[in-house]
Amino acid sequence: MRVDLNCDLGEAFGNYSFGGDHQIIPLITSANVACGFHAGDENVMNETVKLAKAHNVAVGAHPGLPDLKGFGRRNIDISNEEIYNLMIYQLGALQGFCRIHQVKINHVKPHGALYQMGAKDREIASVIAQAVYDFDPSLVLVGLANSYLISEAKNVGLITASEVFADRRYEDDGQLVSRKESDAVITDTDEALKQVLKMVKENKVISKNNKEVTLQADTICVHGDGEHALLFVSKIREILMKEGIDIQSL
């Protein structure tokens, strides 16, 4: 049994810094690097790619909506053409830094509202998947397990990775509980570990209404901006190794 452990990183910009990227990267297998629209900038992207390479961590693009104020977590009325173009733009930005550091982009995981829009809307998911395929058909598209991001990526011929979350609660239909709700984020370490083991070993998660939901767990996400990110990543890695589960990049 194997699973990838990923984290959204490189989300500082300008004079604003947060997250424990330097402490987290040695513990994960895949880094999703912000590409400048929701967070990150040219200096942070460069440093994050260097850091990932130094620790042999797979580099992935983490493109988001152009919304620094809302950290890319607010829905924006945006056309399919704009979604396609912002995907290509951000992938190109990260590719530049990967090229100078002789690192290949391994995967793509949309961020925040863009991720949720693609998970719930087949047409948007198709646009996202097509952009990734047109940029590089060898890239892995990471998306919410059982969502349109996964099905539409498969339809265009991409390799997919079904993602599960250590620090988020689930609805009965397998979607994530909205961050607008007070119980959306898991902050208790034991609860997070229990959820991770059930998802990885049983391919199931218990929803907020105590319903058992079936899902595939190819990669586990911990949000790098979370208050308990470093602790969660450390404990998840520890318990997976204790259970004999291999932690490998996508």
UniProtKB/Swiss-Prot annotation:
GO terms under biological process: carbohydrate metabolic process
InterPro entries hit by this protein: Glyco_hydro/deAcase_b/a-brl (IPR011330), LamB/YcsF/PxpA-like (IPR005501)
GO molecular-function terms, A-Z: 5-oxoprolinase (ATP-hydrolyzing) activity; ATP binding
Keyword ATP-binding: yes
Catalytic activity: 5-oxo-L-proline + ATP + 2 H2O = L-glutamate + ADP + phosphate + H(+)
UniProt entry keywords in alphabetical sequence: ATP-binding, Hydrolase, Nucleotide-binding
Enzyme class: hydrolase
EC number: 3.5.2.9
One protein family per Pfam: LamB_YcsF
Entry function: Catalyzes the cleavage of 5-oxoproline to form L-glutamate coupled to the hydrolysis of ATP to ADP and inorganic phosphate.
Assembly and oligomerization: Forms a complex composed of PxpA, PxpB and PxpC.
Similarity section: Belongs to the LamB/PxpA family.
Name of protein: 5-oxoprolinase subunit A
Gene coding for it: pxpA
